[in-house]
């Protein structure tokens, strides 16, 4: 396979015939968040809400959100594909269909979904399709996965507002996928809160420089 064929393959979602089989057993992780000590997989306090964000390499994206007041816990993992309980190595092949994502569990009384969405839009480039900077492939696509219809509508409205802001600067179109949350598979323990364990580690986040105009209240 030539370089160009390999590149083109990485930019395409795999067919059902190509998808790796995965496994029944979940990938093991620590029980608690390395930074906050809160339960990584629950149970979480009553009233917490969830959202999944994919914005390139999940290391930097997770750190972005765990630092936000009102965010109870974060975790990195894989979602949006077909392979059950994939490994990192499998996901990197592009043959699972999954994107690298961050699970954000938050208290809506302290931080709104719109505030989280503003960070999402401003801190990566949502116009790059199946890549994010030098990270190339379907694994790094921009996604928002929501857990109810109301939150999905909020996310879609924010996308429309940010699309207009980008267009006014000659940028776009937005390629971010917004859907109902699919199955979320936790990534390996060494990926969880990676930049807290490795402060000098890689962080590929880079925004467009365009501010998000959405109102920060619900």
From Swiss-Prot:
InterPro entries given in the database record: Met_Sox_Rdtase_MsrA_dom (IPR002569), Met_Sox_Rdtase_MsrA_sf (IPR036509), MsrA_MetSO_reductase (IPR050162)
Single annotated GO MF: peptide-methionine (S)-S-oxide reductase activity
Alphabetized SUPFAM superfamilies for the sequence: Peptide methionine sulfoxide reductase (SSF55068)
A GO biological-process term: cellular response to oxidative stress
Alphabetically ordered keywords of this record: Oxidoreductase
Active-site residues from the entry: 57
Keyword Cytoplasm: no
First-tier enzyme category under EC: oxidoreductase
NCBIfam families the UniProt entry points to: msrA
Family statement drawn from the similarity comment of this UniProt entry: Belongs to the MsrA Met sulfoxide reductase family.
Protein function: Has an important function as a repair enzyme for proteins that have been inactivated by oxidation. Catalyzes the reversible oxidation-reduction of methionine sulfoxide in proteins to methionine.
Protein name: Peptide methionine sulfoxide reductase MsrA
């Amino acid at each position: 396979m030539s370089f160009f064929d390999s590149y083109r393959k990485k930019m395409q979602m795999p067919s059902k015939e190509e998808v790796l089989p995965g496994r029944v057993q979940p990938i093991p992780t620590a029980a608690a968040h390395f930074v906050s000590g809160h339960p990584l997989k629950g149970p979480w306090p009553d009233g917490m809400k969830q959202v999944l964000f994919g914005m390139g390499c999940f290391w930097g994206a997770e750190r972005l959100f765990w630092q936000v007041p009102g965010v109870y816990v974060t975790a990195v993992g894989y979602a949006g594909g077909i392979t059950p309980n994939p490994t990192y190595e499998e996901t990197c092949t592009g043959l699972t269909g999954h994107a690298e994502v961050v699970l954000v569990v938050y208290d809506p009384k302290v931080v709104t979904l719109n505030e989280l969405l503003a960070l999402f839009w401003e801190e990566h480039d949502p116009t790059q399709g199946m890549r994010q900077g030098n990270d190339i492939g379907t694994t790094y696509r921009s996604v928002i996965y929501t857990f109810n219809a109301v939150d999905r509508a909020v996310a879609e409205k924010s996308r429309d507002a940010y699309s207009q802001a980008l267009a006014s600067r000659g940028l776009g179109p937005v390629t971010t996928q917004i859907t109902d949350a699919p199955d979320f598979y936790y990534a390996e323990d060494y990926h969880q809160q990676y930049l807290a364990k490795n402060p000098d580690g890689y962080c590929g986040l880079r925004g467009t420089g365009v501010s998000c105009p959405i109102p920060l209240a619900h």
